[in-house]
């Protein structure tokens, strides 16, 4: 379920009739009447492998997050209307069956897709009665996505329902799951003890702008800058380098290896938090590393070493497309700096690369209304667009905004 959600990052970026977001349809087809959706469904069928009350049966719940992103890139409101009932029903099932009395959510190592990360003792296949920070943060994010969908579809009661849950959940997360000594969000046991590890799972909290109080945001993000924490030579490790279980030599799965889709997730969170320069720097580091390894091995890999150049162990070639599905939007959004919001007919371009050479993008899809080319040097942006847009340019601490009609134009930055 989680990997399929990440594959949909390509939705809106690949021209043609195939829509990556439709990969999620097989999960909706397998949905139980209760609202439960299995995490494992075979391609081409609605056959599911897990039973609902198996602790490992579902998650991570990223479906609404992926659907809303696809909507912002394509403007396909009809799809939101079609999938919203399934998304709302699954959220309610998770709220009824994956929470503790205080409203915090649980998962397992397996269901979280950080399978061998020892953040919760003996938690690979069982929740151990802990509250898990990624499941809680994803639930907050899910509430935001569902509220936006409900408002779009004029479903006021359901918008209020998820907004009320979110307010309560944010309060409890910040009361219980913030480790003030470390300035970090962590899993919490039934006795109130924090996990002994700093996991990349905590950075799901960045994806919702309402979750982290302002006074906690900068120290929480600082861990992504500290070389003894998450700022290893190649970014970002799934465990901080100062965690006891961190494995610098092999990566050992989720005990320190770098997974491109999780690095991209953190960059998306930094974008929400408006820490754009850091997201850009992390993207440059990561894309360069993946490119160098691809040059030497002629392969994309599921995960990479954090302190040496090469694939991490277990050494597994990426055959699902998960790594390119992270790298392509990472290049477009955080290296080149493009952000498309098609319902608003708007493109933001944060120009962070050196303008000494011409750079930009060709054939960037504009929903279903054609494509756009945006190429620039230091002084001029060359534009060819099939549809009128609003273009907002962030350049050298200056912001330019202009309405661009369909056609070909040169825009001076002098």
Task: Give residue ranges: language-model regions.
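Conserved hydrophobic/aromatic pocket- or pore-lining residues that grip, position, or stack substrates
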Residues: 8, 166, 205
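Charge-dense, low-complexity intrinsically disordered segments
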Residues: 14, 81, 126-133, 153-156, ...
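Extended glycan-interaction surfaces of carbohydrate-active proteins
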Residues: 22-54, 99-131, 171-258, 291-313, ...
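Non-catalytic C-terminal accessory modules of carbohydrate-active enzymes
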Residues: 221-230, 265-414
């Amino acid at each position: 379920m989680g990997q399929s959600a990440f594959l949909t990052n390509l939705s809106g970026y690949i021209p043609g009739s195939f829509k990556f977001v439709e990969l999620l349809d097989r999960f909706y087809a397998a949905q139980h009447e209760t609202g439960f959706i299995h995490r494992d469904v075979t391609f081409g069928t609605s056959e599911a492998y897990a039973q609902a009350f198996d602790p490992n049966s579902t998650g991570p719940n990223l479906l609404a997050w992926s659907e809303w992103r696809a909507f912002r890139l394509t403007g396909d409101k009809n799809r939101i209307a079609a999938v919203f009932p399934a998304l709302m029903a699954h959220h309610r099932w998770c709220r009824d069956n994956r929470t503790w009395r205080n409203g915090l959510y649980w998962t397992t190592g397996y269901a979280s897709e950080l399978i061998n990360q020892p953040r919760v003792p003996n938690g690979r296949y069982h929740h151990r009665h802990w509250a898990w920070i990624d499941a809680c943060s994803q639930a907050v994010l899910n509430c935001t996505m569902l509220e936006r969908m409900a408002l779009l579809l004029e479903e006021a009661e359901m918008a209020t329902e998820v907004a009320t849950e979110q307010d309560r959940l944010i309060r409890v997360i910040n009361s219980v799951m913030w480790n003030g000594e470390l300035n970090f969000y962590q899993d919490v046991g039934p006795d109130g003890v924090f996990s002994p590890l700093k996991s990349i799972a905590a950075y799901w909290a960045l994806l919702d702008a309402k979750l982290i109080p302002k006074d906690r945001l900068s120290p929480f993000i600082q861990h992504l800058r500290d070389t003894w924490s998450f700022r290893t030579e190649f970014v970002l490790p799934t465990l901080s380098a100062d965690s006891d279980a961190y494995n610098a030599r092999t990566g050992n799965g989720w005990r320190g290896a770098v997974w491109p889709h999780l690095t991209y997730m953190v960059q998306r969170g930094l974008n929400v938090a408006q820490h754009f320069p850091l997201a850009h720097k992390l993207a440059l580091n990561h894309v360069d590393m993946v490119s160098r390894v691809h040059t030497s091995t002629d392969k994309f890999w599921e995960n990479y070493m954090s302190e040496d150049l090469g694939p991490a162990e277990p050494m597994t070639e990426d055959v699902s497309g998960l790594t390119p599905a992270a790298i392509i939007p990472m290049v477009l959004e955080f290296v080149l700096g493009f952000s498309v919001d098609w319902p608003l007919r708007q493109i933001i371009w944060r120009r962070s690369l050196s303008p000494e050479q011409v750079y930009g993008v060709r054939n960037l899809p504009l929903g279903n209304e054609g494509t756009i080319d945006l190429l620039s040097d230091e002084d001029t942006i060359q534009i060819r667009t099939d549809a009128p847009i609003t273009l907002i340019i962030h350049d050298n601490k200056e912001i330019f905004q202009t309405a661009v009609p369909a056609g070909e134009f040169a825009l001076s930055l002098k």
